[in-house]
A protein has these predicted regions:
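Ferredoxin-like alpha/beta domains used as RNA- or RNAP-binding modules
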Residues: 1-20, 26-135
């Protein structure tokens, strides 16, 4: 069986609070772990997409519209739909399993991931990932 859930693959979440949101696979567990026996992955995604920026907006308004909110989540493979896109964003050292369990580590990891996502958005790369999924 070909493994399509690789690091950096862009996926769309199908179930739960973040259904319909885009995310990136940070780490995959094909054989499961002791706590979760099923195959799953750790994803980092966009909770809130950046708004559309127009030319007449001021610099302050442009900065406000360019903000993103992100999330981390362990997701079952059956609850994600892989896409053909990849995002070469290095979040492996930012996000880890223990960072999700403790609250202070999670807050700092979310801030780091947010800055990386915003930086990627401002450079103009991976435009598909930062646009809202219309359905």
């Amino acid at each position: 069986m070909v493994k399509c859930m690789k690091l950096g693959k862009a996926v769309i979440l199908l179930q739960g609070r973040y259904a319909g949101k885009k995310a990136v696979i940070v780490k995959s567990f094909d054989d499961g772990t002791d706590e979760k026996r099923y195959s799953h992955c750790l994803v980092a995604g966009l909770k809130k997409y950046p708004s559309k920026v127009i030319r007449k907006d001021s610099a302050k308004k442009t900065a406000k519209k360019s903000r993103v909110k992100c999330f981390f989540k362990f997701v079952n493979y059956q609850h994600v739909m892989p896409t053909r896109y990849t995002l070469d964003l290095d979040l492996k050292n930012v996000v880890s399993g223990d960072a999700i369990s403790s609250n202070d580590k999670k807050v700092t990891a979310l801030k780091e991931a947010k800055s990386k996502f915003e930086e990627r958005f401002k450079t103009g790369k991976n435009r598909w990932f930062f646009s809202k999924l219309r359905f």
